[in-house]
């Protein structure tokens, strides 16, 4: 099988639906790839690996195929609850919103898994 991080969301969801891939494996593969390339790319300002993997595990244990489990990241100008939002400046370095932006809330309600900020 292809490395899970290389799969399209459509292909990964099909494999999850056929019990050939877990959400945990998919998210874990994404983090492995990020760790492998981040020194070169320098794209991520915040990663939430522990919470993301825990969420993936919860979705896998539920067995609910309607919860997609798609890993997603957002720009550091968009709020995600209990996650630093720095707007790319030191002035806001201690800004930790308590609520998700509407787009993040909708993604999470659909079972998508927040992995971090770029």
Predicted regions and their residues:
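An N-terminal boundary/leader segment
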Residues: 1-46
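Glycine-rich loop at the start of a catalytic domain that most often binds anionic cofactors/ligands
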Residues: 56-61, 85
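Flexible N-terminal pre-Rossmann segment of NAD(P)-dependent oxidoreductases
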Residues: 3-7, 62-70
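Amphipathic alpha-helical segments that form the core helices of the histone-fold
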Residues: 34-35, 53-57
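Enzymes and membrane/adaptor proteins characterized by extended Gly/Ser/Thr/Asp/Glu-rich
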Residues: 66-106, 110
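Short secondary-structure junction/hinge motifs that connect adjacent elements
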Residues: 26-29, 44-53, 67-74
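Long amphipathic alpha-helix in the N-terminal Rossmann-like dinucleotide-binding domain
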Residues: 50-54, 108-112
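General beta-strand structural signal in soluble alpha/beta enzymes
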Residues: 74, 114-117
């Amino acid at each position: 099988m292809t490395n899970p991080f290389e799969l399209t969301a459509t292909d990964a969801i099909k494999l999850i639906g056929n019990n050939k891939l877990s959400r945990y494996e998919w998210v874990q593969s994404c983090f492995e790839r990020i760790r492998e390339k981040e020194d070169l790319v320098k794209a991520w300002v915040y990663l939430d690996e522990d919470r993301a993997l825990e969420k993936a595990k919860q979705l896998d244990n539920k067995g609910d195929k309607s919860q997609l489990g798609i890993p997603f990241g957002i720009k550091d100008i968009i709020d995600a609850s209990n996650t630093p939002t720095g707007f790319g400046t030191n002035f806001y370095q201690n800004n930790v919103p308590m609520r998700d932006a509407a787009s993040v809330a909708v993604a999470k309600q659909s079972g998508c898994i927040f992995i971090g900020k770029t």
